Amino acid sequence: MYLSRSAEWSALESHYQDISHQAMIDLFSTDPNRHERFSLSFNAIHLDYSKNRISARTMELLMDLVRRSGIEKKRRQMFEGEQINFTEHRSVLHTALRRPPGYTMTIDGNDVASEVSDVLDQMKAFCKKVISGEWKGYTGKRITDVVNIGIGGSDLGPFMVTEALKPFAHGKLKVHFVSNVDGSHLVETLRGLNPETTLFIIASKTFTTQETLANAVSARAWFLVKAGNRDHVAKHFVAVSTNREKVEEFGIDPDNMFRFWDWVGGRYSLWSAIGLSIALYLGFDRFRELLAGAHAMDEHFLNAPLEENMPMILAMLGIWYNNFFGAHSQAIIPYDQYLHRFPAYLQQLDMESNGKRVDRAGHEVDYATGPVIWGEPGTNAQHAFFQLLHQGTEIVPVDFIVSLKSQNPVGEHHDMLVANCFAQSEALMKGKSEAEARAELEAAGLSGGDLEKLLPHKLFPGNRPTNTIVLDELNPFNLGSLIALYEHKVFVQGVVWNINSFDQWGVELGKQLAKAILPEFDAVDPVETHDASTNALINRYRQFRNGLKFPKSNQLKMF
């Protein structure tokens, strides 16, 4: 039966009518154990989901819906390597990358465990050489800077992790990331670097990704201006790829190619050799801790009862708001500056996975799927868009993420940070009533018409849902668990919505059209092969590119 016509869906629609007008503050007043009822801890991660518009009955109905989806079977299929990415005929086995030694798994006749172990050993040996200074550049100097050139999952994950774990870096290497094909990204990154002491990681599964190869070729040209001899490329460029021929053609020693597999999706690839920049920056042992943390969350996801399962709970709360409250975006607010790239990382993880409009049978869905994910670190976010969260017309569920321990204890800074995090979750839940606002204005000396005019602007409706995820400390193990928590949340939602969370065909169309437009910039005659708007834009750029002056706008006469 179609999801939106199932008995479980209908029960939630009916329940929404009963609970949608209830105020969370009243639910807390009538249930002194509400926090204990709606919170749980796993290792060093605590999830408080009590500030949601839910009751025990809500959670029962949500768990009925997730059971209807066959989540336990789908979960087993993913972990056992079945081809759940059916549009690309691929297994989904990023979880295999973080399993400890000793397991066995065979996919298409290949010993997955052995292959993963071999690549990890290769990464470990390489990291040891570079960090110790044994690996030297073409002039005999040790490497001081590592530049990762990749895009999408080859950039977002490693960049986020290296930023998040800066306090755990060994300090012998600086790491930089280039992703955008905009030449400014490469130029500004290379400014001040020394070709003699710079190592480039070219991260591209096929070694044909347009943006990555453009940046790699330009980086090589920059390097050769000083190095001169193309033979020196092998000492300063390594690859994470599966295309040995293209890697060797570029000038990279195939012994310095770190492989990964088609069962590793880009947005899940930081656990693979794509994480080489992480391992170089932190040291391989720290990278192993990151993997161990993710594996711990994998085990929790596999074994915890649905009602006590963090990814399941987060996933179903998201569905509750997206599909029944019509809340089609979610804010991720880490109260930790080291996590400043975490919202951007989650954008790809969530929106590329679940931004789908057809179900697994190819039919258009009649319900919302993946929400818009956005966010910034607190407290910066408070001074940017919290106005909308508190008093806007849209309900935006929020995930707050905060660490109890600061890596940089300075005065009362961390106390202030944590106080703001907890205060925002309380404020979004409680709001401010007319009586409270009136009393505040009267205490400030306002009365009569002035008070009445200002009063509506001082009201906060409250009843805005939030989760608060509390880490004991942001360290490699806990970050690994946090990332895996969101990975599995996204997977569960995709299963419930009956979509394929592991392909990304929506990325392709624009890339195809860009390949057609690029040679048209060199056309002799005006371009007329597109719609009128696109033709005009192309021809305008061609005029500028060819050094012609633009015609003056008639509007200029107005000034």
From Swiss-Prot:
Query: What's a single GO BP term from this record?
Result: glycolytic process
Catalyses which reaction(s): alpha-D-glucose 6-phosphate = beta-D-fructose 6-phosphate
Q: Does the keyword Glycosyltransferase apply?
A: no
Indicate where this protein is primarily found: cytoplasm
Which Pfam families does this UniProt record tie to the protein? PGI (PF00342)
Q: State the EC number(s).
A: 5.3.1.9
Active-site positions, per UniProt? 352, 383, 511
Give the CC-aspect GO terms.
cytosol
Q: Does the keyword Isomerase apply?
A: yes
Enumerate the UniProt keywords alphabetically: Cytoplasm, Gluconeogenesis, Glycolysis, Isomerase
Q: Which GO terms describe its molecular function?
A: carbohydrate derivative binding; glucose-6-phosphate isomerase activity; monosaccharide binding
| Functional pathway | Carbohydrate biosynthesis; gluconeogenesis; Carbohydrate degradation; glycolysis; D-glyceraldehyde 3-phosphate and glycerone phosphate from D-glucose: step 2/4
Its subcellular locations are: Cytoplasm
PANTHER family per UniProt: GLUCOSE-6-PHOSPHATE ISOMERASE
Give the protein's biological function. Answer: Catalyzes the reversible isomerization of glucose-6-phosphate to fructose-6-phosphate.
Q: Which family does it belong to?
A: Belongs to the GPI family.
What protein name is recorded for this chain? Glucose-6-phosphate isomerase
